[in-house]
Amino acid sequence: MAEVNIIYVTVFILKGITNRPELQAPCFGVFLVIYLVTVLGNLGLITLIKIDTRLHTPMYYFLSHLAFVDLCYSSAITPKMMVNFVVERNTIPFHACATQLGCFLTFMITECFLLASMAYDCYVAICSPLHYSTLMSRRVCIQLVAVPYIYSFLVALFHTVITFRLTYCGPNLINHFYCDDLPFLALSCSDTHMKEILIFAFAGFDMISSSSIVLTSYIFIIAAILRIRSTQGQHKAISTCGSHMVTVTIFYGTLIFMYLQPKSNHSLDTDKMASVFYTVVIPMLNPLIYSLRNKEVKDASKKALDKGCENLQILTFLKIRKLY
C-alpha cells in the first residue's frame, strides 16, 4: 500500500479586506483613526464613570463594562488588520489564529447579553421605579455582568477547541480579515458538518435569547411611556434609555443582516463588510452615542474637562512662579 504524505497547515494567510495596493495606505489611515477614537472613547468613558460619583449607578456600571467589551473585541481584530495593510504577506500562526477567534467570540457574545442586561435595567427603571434599588441591587448587577462573561468564555472555548482540533491539510488562505469560524472551516479537510450545526445552534440561541430579552423589555417600556400623560415625563423616560435603543438597533441590525439574509444573497465578501461594521465601527460609535445623547455623561465630561483645565492653569502658574 502506497504511503500518503499529509502536510498539516501551521500558518494561515488572511485575504484581508482588499488586495488592491493603491487602497492599502488609505485603508490603514482610516482604520488607524477609527481605532484611536475607539480606544480613547471607551477608555475615557470607563475613566469618567470611575471618577465621577454621580455616575456610580447600575446603568453606568453596565455601560462601563460595555465600553470595556467594545475596547477588547476591537483590539482583538483591528491591530492585526492594520498590520496586514502594510506587510506583503498577511500570515497568522495557527495558535495566534485560535487566540484571536477565542477572544473575538468571548467579547462578541458578552456584548449580546450585556445589552440584554442593560435593557432589563431600563425596564426596571421605567416600569418599577419604586422598587429599582431593590431589584437592581449591587449583587444583582454583578450577577447580570458576571453571567455573560462566564457563559461567553465557556462557549468561545468550546467552539475554539472544536475548530482547532479539526485537520487542516489543504489551502491555507482564509477569505476574511480575521480568524472567523465559517471562513476557517472552509479550509478543513475534516468533516465539518457537525461543527457547522453547532455554530448555527449556538448563534441562534444567543441571538434569539438575548434579543428576546431586549424586545420584551422595550415592549413594556414603550407601553409604560405611552401611559405617561405629561410630555415632559415621556421625554424624560425616553432619554433614560434612548442611547441604549440606538446601540441595540445598530448592533442587532448588523447581526440580523448577516445571518437572516436570503442564502442566494449570502457571501463571505458581504460578511466581511458587515464584520467591519460590528468589529471596528460599532465599538467606536457606542461611546460617542452615549456621550452625545446622555446629559449626565455630558455634564460629567464637562466637569472633568473644567477640572483638568483648572489643574493645568495652577501647574502653569506654579512653574512660572518658580522661574521668577
Swiss-Prot record:
Q: Which CDD domains match?
A: 7tmA_OR8K-like
Write out the topological domains of type Cytoplasmic.
47-54, 121-139, 218-237, 293-324
Q: What PROSITE patterns does the annotation carry?
A: G_PROTEIN_RECEP_F1_2 (PS50262)
Q: Which residues cross the membrane?
A: 26-46, 55-75, 100-120, 140-160, 197-217, 238-258, 272-292
Q: What keywords were assigned to this record?
A: Cell membrane, Disulfide bond, G-protein coupled receptor, Glycoprotein, Membrane, Olfaction, Receptor, Sensory transduction, Transducer, Transmembrane, Transmembrane helix
Q: Where in the cell is it found?
A: Cell membrane
Glycan-carrying positions: 265
The record's function comment reads: Odorant receptor.
Q: What is this protein called?
A: Olfactory receptor 8U3
Q: Which organism is it from?
A: Homo sapiens
